[in-house]
Regions:
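Alpha-solenoid helical repeat scaffolds
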Residues: 1-183
Length: 183
């Protein structure tokens, strides 16, 4: 069973006899499956430090996802940033943006999305949509409308972007009204 397999692999790891990349990967995946993703992440980092694991796309992605599962957003952000550098694309930075949003850090999310778009994405429409939302939430309506219009130009995000454009316009009107009556 999984618990026994994990125990066996952990013992081999602690005794320093677990050196094969595939075995370490199995142990990491079992730890994550058993609900101890923080342990899995620490094993990966230890494998990196000991030179047992390559700092490649596969293992850095495993590390990032383990930190997400462990609810260690700051550590996950660092791992996803490294993954973006290794993969040479912006997909991991969209994950970074989402983690920043979970933490209520709008500006950091905006920066991550802009960099993700610059690096290139398979699903740029969703990134533009999210960027438009982030900008609207920061009362930056002019740039929000630009991003949302870009999102509307992609078939996948066309409907959502159109709805957000309407909503952002309402937000802008309310914002302008509040500014006019406060002053």
């Amino acid at each position: 069973d999984e618990a026994m397999a994990l125990s066996t692999l952990r013992l081999a790891w602690s005794e320093g006899v677990l050196e094969r990349e595939a075995s370490i990967k199995s142990m990491v995946q079992l730890a994550a499956a058993r609900g101890i993703p923080d342990h899995a992440a620490r094993m990966i980092e230890s494998g990196f430090e000991q030179g047992l694991l390559p700092r490649d796309e596969t293992f850095v992605r495993l590390l990032a996802n383990a930190w997400v599962s462990a609810k260690e957003n700051k550590l996950a952000i660092g791992a996803f940033r490294r993954l973006s550098e290794i993969a040479k694309n912006g997909e991991p930075l969209v994950r970074v943006a989402n983690l920043y949003l979970e933490m209520g850090q709008w500006q950091q999310a905006e920066q991550a999305l802009e960099k993700a778009i610059d690096l290139g994405l398979d699903d740029a429409g969703s990134a533009y949509l999210l960027l438009g939302i982030v900008l609207a939430e920061q009362d930056n309506y002019k740039e929000s409308f630009v991003a949302l219009r870009r999102a509307r130009s992609f078939e996948k995000t066309q409907r959502q972007a159109a709805k957000w454009l309407s909503y952002a316009e309402d937000m802008r009107k309310q914002y302008e009204w509040q500014r006019a009556y406060r002053g």
